[in-house]
A protein has these predicted regions:
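Predominantly flavin-linked oxidoreductase catalytic cores and closely associated redox partners
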Residues: 1-139, 155
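FAD/FMN-dependent oxidoreductases across multiple families
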Residues: 7-11, 115-200, 205
């Protein structure tokens, strides 16, 4: 396997019935041509590959926007526990704090475009969120914010996004597979990458359309039901009444509290209850990303 580091995509030179050729360039501006059976485009929301194919959507800025910063010297409960805050003015967005090592956390918030706050207001809103009593208390009085914040758009429209073209398969943010309820996209990106590999293997020595159709079928099977479920729940969470009702249900017992987090961050698929083909023996029992607290 040949691995090229420090290179970037330039353009799609040609597509033929049996291969695709692309131009790439290195950090020292040295150009090179690469030929392969397929290109898997994992190049983000703004996908230069998609743009090269003339498939970009003018004016598209994503469904969500996220804002994040790291902090250290955390002494409150956020040091060891995952926190999710459903602030009334952020709904259906939310704020989060993920514990890291040595008293550090990843803390931030996300908003749905078209909500109460614009993307341009996120920077000014940040100090206000950090000063709110319950958030400040979770971090502790000695918390130190690190470096600068980062912000980025989140594409979450897998049911309408282009997934393939010719001998190109789009995955991850390039395929807009991000969860439309939480904005989480790492797991979705990994899964879409696996599905693209399965589709290519299934179409070996056959027309490109076989691989494209297989990939789109796999994406539909693995993402569409979850996307629709997330969109429905997002509508409910837009109101404070809906959010309170959902949290009351989640807070009924230690079991519901524990599995709400597993479900929200998709240790199990979002719509798993309605897609029996994805049930398995250890359903809701396997370990997630964070330690269980009863």
């Amino acid at each position: 396997i040949r691995v090229l580091e420090g290179h970037e995509f330039v353009s799609v030179r040609e597509q033929t019935p049996d291969h695709i050729t692309i131009d790439i360039s290195s950090n020292n501006n040295k150009s090179e041509t690469v030929q392969s059976k397929f290109v898997i485009a994992s190049d983000g929301m703004w996908s230069p590959v998609r743009k090269s194919l003339g498939m970009s959507t003018p004016g598209y800025l994503g469904e969500w926007h996220a804002f994040r910063q790291y902090a250290n010297n955390v002494t409150g409960s956020a040091k060891d526990r995952l926190h999710v805050w459903f602030e009334k003015d952020l709904l259906p967005g939310y704020a989060w704090s993920f514990p890291l090592q040595d008293g550090r956390v990843n803390i931030g918030f996300g908003i749905l475009r078209g909500g109460k706050y614009s993307v341009q207001q996120m920077k000014d809103l940040w100090p206000n969120l950090l000063a709110r009593k319950h958030i400040a208390g979770a971090l502790g009085s000695g918390v130190v914010m690190e470096d600068r914040h980062t912000a980025w758009p989140i594409p979450a429209r897998v049911t309408s996004a282009p997934l393939s073209s010719g001998r190109v398969l789009f995955i991850g943010d390039a395929a807009c597979v991000t969860d439309s309820l939480t904005g989480e996209g790492i797991g979705q990106a990994l899964l879409s990458g696996q599905l693209s590999a399965r589709a290519i293997l299934a179409g070996i020595n056959r027309e490109a359309s076989v691989t494209r159709n297989k990939y789109e079928q796999l994406v539909k099977q693995n993402f569409f039901a979850d996307h629709r479920m997330s969109a429905t729940l997002g509508t409910i969470l837009k109101s404070s009444l809906g959010a309170r009702a959902a949290l009351r249900v989640a807070n009924l017992t230690p079991w519901t509290r524990r599995n709400f987090v597993h479900w929200m961050f998709e240790d199990e698929p979002r719509a798993a209850a309605f897609t029996p083909r994805r049930w398995h023996k250890g359903f809701l029992k396997r370990d997630g990303a964070f330690k269980n607290y009863g």
